[in-house]
């Protein structure tokens, strides 16, 4: 892997991790079209660190408040809307953990094909469009009860199917439940913190036990590039989502999915 490849892959990861357009659909393009080799475990860990740092730093005030409220509810029995939201994020994380443990091998063996990614990119794009057009868009994230959190968590678990998009699935579920676009996006981004942490930790453990060589320059490129691109992406998405809605992302997903099918049929 060259520094240019490291930069491009980290940029793709940072830009697509938090937009409802599927990072997996984009990350297969360099290897499928340009023949780039797999970037390896170490680089995967690096871009997870970068994107995690971006969302934690962007929502640093909320993260500190939610952690404090969560611990206060555990050790002092205090109840607050912040503690409730923190517990809803915990509940929403559980389905993905279970699904990942049970279905990891099935996904890796049977569902990582370009045809699956193209199909899910289109189908979940259309679902996002339908929900965005018909949702009530009234509630904020603090109104989520455990049933809503579990529903969104199941959507996050299904997003492990390549091409679905974690942010796309969770935002779609939140919109369906009546969240405003901004609240759906914020809840999705806050939900990403524990799941990216767990995924990155799992990859880090695999890296340590694999003995794979580590190239510090590539890792720094991955961390810095994914951090900057993800941070800017979160900021711009939250600023623009209320007035532009989800239609631009739906159109992009349809073009991407059709383009992938066209490439596969001509290859």
Curated annotation (Swiss-Prot):
Swiss-Prot/TrEMBL keywords:
Antibiotic resistance, Cell inner membrane, Cell membrane, Cell shape, Cell wall biogenesis/degradation, Hydrolase, Membrane, Peptidoglycan synthesis, Transmembrane, Transmembrane helix
Any stretches that span the bilayer, and where are they? Answer: 1-21, 39-59, 83-103, 111-131, 144-164, 189-209, 218-238, 246-266
Keyword Transmembrane helix appears in the UniProt entry: yes
Under Gene Ontology molecular function, one entry of this record is: undecaprenyl-diphosphatase activity
**Reactions catalysed, as given in the entry:** di-trans,octa-cis-undecaprenyl diphosphate + H2O = di-trans,octa-cis-undecaprenyl phosphate + phosphate + H(+)
Query: Among the record's GO biological process terms, what is one?
Result: response to antibiotic
Show the GO cellular component annotation of the record. Answer: plasma membrane
How does the protein's chain sit in the membrane according to the entry?
Answer: Multi-pass membrane protein
The question of whether Protease is a record keyword is answered with: no
Q: Enzyme class, one word?
A: hydrolase
Question: Which compartments is it annotated to reside in?
Answer: Cell inner membrane
Task: Give the principal location in a single coarse category.
Answer: membrane
* EC number, as in UniProt: 3.6.1.27
**Extra information:** Bacitracin is thought to be involved in the inhibition of peptidoglycan synthesis by sequestering undecaprenyl diphosphate, thereby reducing the pool of lipid carrier available.
Concerning its family, UniProt says:
Belongs to the UppP family.
Function of the molecule = Catalyzes the dephosphorylation of undecaprenyl diphosphate (UPP). Confers resistance to bacitracin.
Q: What name does UniProt use for this protein?
A: Undecaprenyl-diphosphatase
